[in-house]
């Protein structure tokens, strides 16, 4: 599935290193610290599930690692790029190599599934031809059990089917890191297994890594590690 250029080199044995990261939001009641001196290492090929109660800081940590949110305190290295300060080039480089899967799929209503996936391939440095993108789209959708929707629009699909399209969109560029925020929340058991199975095959084939934020205990047993955030602090295996 992935191109040879997507394979990780031995130069970066860890996909993610988080050291001493803290994050504080300003609220009406005063500053609220949601991350408190968090350390985390995500190894190449590793699949980690991150769980914890709502407001524990899980999504904040995910968006910091994905260079969506700017770092306040501590250090984060993602795929060899140091995040922090005003180095927007490093942030852009990370975002190009990450596949994001969010609970809110945000599909364009006017685009077919294939158009959505083909549009996503334009975000990388060397986008594939239409023919190559079409073949990859067919393969991903078949593995997710929705190949019949290649030329469908979102209004023609169920919520779970649209979520699986979002998974395909995240994987079509063979990302070196997958970050997911409740990616299986709208899926039944069978669909969840299809999604996690596809992610695991991608990790095995490329050496990529995955960090998935979820309350879905159905997938805990499919992860290499299950970590818990509580009151901004990262605890051991849940």
Q: Where are these predicted regions, by residue range?
A:
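ABC ATPase NBD coupling module
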Residues: 32, 83-99
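Conserved ABC transporter NBD signature motif
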Residues: 74-85
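Short coil-to-helix segment of the ABC ATPase nucleotide-binding domain corresponding to the Q-loop/switch region
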Residues: 111-120
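Conserved ABC ATPase signature
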Residues: 153-157, 161
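Conserved catalytic motifs of ABC-family nucleotide-binding domains
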Residues: 174
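Helix-to-loop junction immediately C-terminal to a conserved catalytic motif
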Residues: 66
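Catalytic Walker B motif of ABC-type/P-loop ATPase nucleotide-binding domains
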Residues: 178-181
């Amino acid at each position: 599935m992935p191109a040879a250029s997507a394979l990780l080199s031995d130069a970066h044995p860890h996909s993610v290193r988080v050291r001493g990261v803290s994050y504080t939001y300003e609220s009406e009641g005063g500053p609220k610290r949601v991350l408190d001196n968090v350390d985390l290492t995500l190894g190449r090929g590793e699949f980690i599930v991150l769980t914890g109660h709502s407001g524990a800081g899980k999504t904040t940590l995910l968006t910091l690692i994905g260079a969506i949110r700017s770092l306040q305190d501590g250090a984060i290295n993602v795929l060899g790029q140091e995040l922090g300060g005003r180095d927007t080039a490093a942030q852009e480089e990370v975002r190009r190599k990450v596949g994001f899967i969010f609970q809110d799929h945000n599909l364009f209503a006017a685009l077919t599934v294939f158009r959505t996936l083909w549009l996503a391939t334009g975000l990388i440095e060397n986008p594939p031809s239409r023919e190559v993108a079409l073949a990859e789209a067919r393969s991903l959708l078949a593995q997710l059990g929705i190949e019949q929707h290649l030329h469908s629009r979102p209004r023609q699909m169920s919520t779970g089917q649209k979520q699986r399209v979002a998974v395909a969109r995240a994987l079509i560029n063979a990302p070196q890191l997958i970050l997911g925020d409740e990616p299986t929340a709208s899926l039944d058991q069978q669909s969840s297994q299809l999604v996690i199975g596809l992610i695991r095959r991608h990790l095995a084939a490329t050496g990529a890594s995955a960090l998935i934020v979820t309350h879905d205990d159905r997938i805990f047993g499919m992860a290499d590690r299950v970590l818990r955030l509580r009151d901004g602090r990262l605890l051991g295996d849940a």
